Design a protein with these regions (language model features):
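A nucleotide- and high-energy phosphate-metabolite-utilizing enzyme signature
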Residues: 1-474
Length: 474
């Protein structure tokens, strides 16, 4: 089938010529892979679904390292192989001599995204181009992670920088388009407050965008001033809908991100957009403990000039209010027990939800931020930084070790998301993928990694229990 044009990728004479020259080196590379039979089978499946082969075969002929990486992806990272099927040209970025140096640099990433989006001729093309560059850059960041070129922490920062840049550019485009019909609300300022992994710069390739839209109107305007004016609350609700659609709507180029807006006041039952004063009132009078926990790492990810500082000041004021230690800790312990019952881990490596996993580390850090914010002195900091600081000031003596464990858990979860479309289905867990996990976590073997992770989970559980007992008396 390969040599007789049985696949679309090999129908062109030029493709078959390249493949003939490539084949000896390709077979040798596959033979060296962890599971040669599986790697060959996956490469054949990959080839059968590839729409065109000329460009890719030419690249693989002339770049040994690229050929080795692609075979490695076949064996250990089927999600990455799938991306190559849909956009074979993403491999071009891997042969750039500057790739290893540039893949972890935010300024380079932002520059590439901005330059690509600047060529959009209209609004819809901008929406499509955001998806194209987003998927390409996600692939390159994931490749940097899985090849060991960058750490899990760096990958999280780059996935987040990509998401923020795309969200910022799309928000500008959405507002320009929206204002053509509805004008602006005089005296209004708008900002996006990010939560979760986006806020802490720990996004993975599969992360949602977790944010809410907050606005403020000075001067008392009640309506927008466009051809089709809208009441202020309706204006910002519609604007939010347009932004969410720009990010989540499927186009011919796919979906950019899923959006999670459950942390807006009153959750999914509340308005899509909220005024700053209403946000503060809700947080101070009606919010649950879990909402305050989430607020401890919230971060403004986009805002009109001067408005970010207002939102940040409001968040600081909310979190500076005294919290009853007993009630806070009781609520945290109850929430964790309910989560264990309603959202049990789906796999032994579901390191977010397993007892002693990421959730427990986050609950320790976030509850400490509620009860000892000034003493910690790291407002809105990511979990690992808070944990390390808790060790420094003696509130959680094991803090430095917990921060280290957080790094290991994050590395495993980043790699799982980058390599596997469904990390919790066993068929993706090939020997090659297991070996990759061990390599990325500096473990001698996968068996040793699994054993060490179990020990780490026990350490986290014990440290969390001691913290909760101590925190009751703060």
């Amino acid at each position: 089938k390969w040599h007789y044009g049985g696949y679309a990728a090999t129908r062109a004479a030029a493709a078959r010529a390249h493949l003939t020259e490539l084949l000896p080196a390709l077979l040798l590379t596959i033979a060296k892979a962890g599971n040669a039979d599986l790697s060959f089978s996956r490469f054949d499946n990959f080839l059968s679904r590839l729409p065109s082969g000329v460009q890719l075969f030419a690249l693989l002929r002339t770049h040994d390292d690229l050929r080795e990486l692609l075979v490695q992806l076949m064996a250990s990272a089927p999600r990455m192989a799938e991306a190559v099927i849909h956009r074979a040209h993403v491999m071009d970025g891997l042969i750039d001599p500057a790739f290893a140096d540039e893949v972890s640099r935010r300024t380079v990433l932002v520059g590439k995204v901005d330059a690509f989006l600047a060529d959009a001729r209209d609004y819809q093309e901008g929406i499509d181009r955001a998806r194209i560059i987003g998927q390409e850059q996600q692939f390159l960041i994931a490749a940097g992670l899985l090849s060991g070129t960058m750490s899990a922490r760096q990958a999280g920062e780059q996935f987040t920088a990509l998401a923020e840049t795309l969200l910022h550019r799309l928000f500008i485009a959405v507002r320009v388009e929206f204002e053509k019909r509805h004008g602006v609300v005089p005296g209004a300022s708008v900002g996006l407050l990010g939560f979760g992994k986006m806020a802490s710069r720990e996004m993975t390739v599969a992360s949602d965008l977790d944010f809410i839209l907050i606005y403020e109107v000075e001067g008392g305007a009640e309506d927008s001033n466009g051809e089709k004016p809208l009441a202020t609350s309706q204006y910002f609700a519609r604007l939010t809908q347009r932004l969410v659609a720009a990010v989540t709507a499927p186009t011919s180029e796919g979906v950019l991100y899923q959006a999670d807006m459950r942390l807006r006041p009153s959750g999914n039952a509340g308005p899509l957009a909220t005024s700053l004063s209403a946000f503060q009132r809700y947080q101070e009078e009606s919010a649950w403990t879990w909402e305050h926990l989430a607020l401890t790492r919230a971060r403004v990810v986009d805002a009109d000039e001067g408005f970010a500082a207002k939102i940040e000041g409001t968040v600081a004021a909310i979190l500076s209010r005294p919290s009853a230690a007993g009630k806070t800790i009781d609520d945290v312990v109850s929430m964790r027990a309910l989560m264990a019952k309603e959202r049990p881990p789906r796999h032994p490596f579901d390191l977010k939800l397993v007892p002693g996993g990421l959730i427990d580390l986050e609950f320790v850090a976030q509850s400490a931020q509620l009860l000892a914010r000034e003493q910690i002195g790291r407002p809105q900091a990511p979990t690992a930084i808070v944990l390390a600081r808790l060790g420094e000031i003696g509130l959680v003596p094991e803090g430095a070790r917990l921060a280290e464990i957080h790094g290991v858990f994050s590395t495993v979860l980043q790699a799982m998301s980058a390599a596997l479309a469904d990390p919790f289905k066993d068929e993706g867990w090939t020997d090659a993928f297991r070996d990759l996990l061990a390599q990325l976590t500096n473990e001698p073997s996968f068996t040793r990694l699994a054993e060490d992770l179990k020990e780490m989970q026990g350490e986290v559980q014990s440290a969390a229990e001691r913290w909760y007992a101590r925190a009751q008396e703060l």
